[in-house]
Amino acid sequence: MLLLRFQRYKEIGYGLYVILFVCTGNTCRSPMAEAFLKNKLVTTTSEIEVFSAGTNAKSNLGATKEAIKVMENFDIDLSNHTTHLLNKQTVEKAELIVAMTRPHELSISKIQQQARNRTFLAGEIVRLGSLISKIEELPSFKSWVEELHSARGGHMTSGRSGDEISDPFDKSLDEYEKVAMRLNGICEVLCKLLTSAVNKNS
């Protein structure tokens, strides 16, 4: 089993690029997404740092037992995860922010209004990524994020309900499995997109 150590730096941003996943409590959705993406990036690039936080998280808790159990099916150990509350420093450091729902997007923009342009729903990135210019045709990672934002048509309310990831907290293990399967698929595509974008900047 791959053991991912969820150690936090005192200052986020040691990697060249910082990707941030955001949910509510930072106990299931965002840490699962963080783990999936970290797992996939291990063999592709070392230039990306992946973190997660919750808009209403209580600090220093662990992932839910259901999340830990489900991730074992993917050979990922989530037992070392520690919850973190979303804050200004974390938002400012992130080049790309992936929110689970539209209310999470709103919470992020309240912390830093400029972050709105680089914040997307989890399903939205995959959907828009297929619509914009090929990454290899763009000059930088930043320009790719800008293209993603432009593809939304300039609307302040982004994404669709189908782009959101439902909260499995206090629900059945089956619901956790459904969320995990979807996040795994999204992170698979996101890994390919990010790797191409980062390699473009190398």
Language-model features: where?
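Short secondary-structure boundary segments
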Residues: 101-102, 123
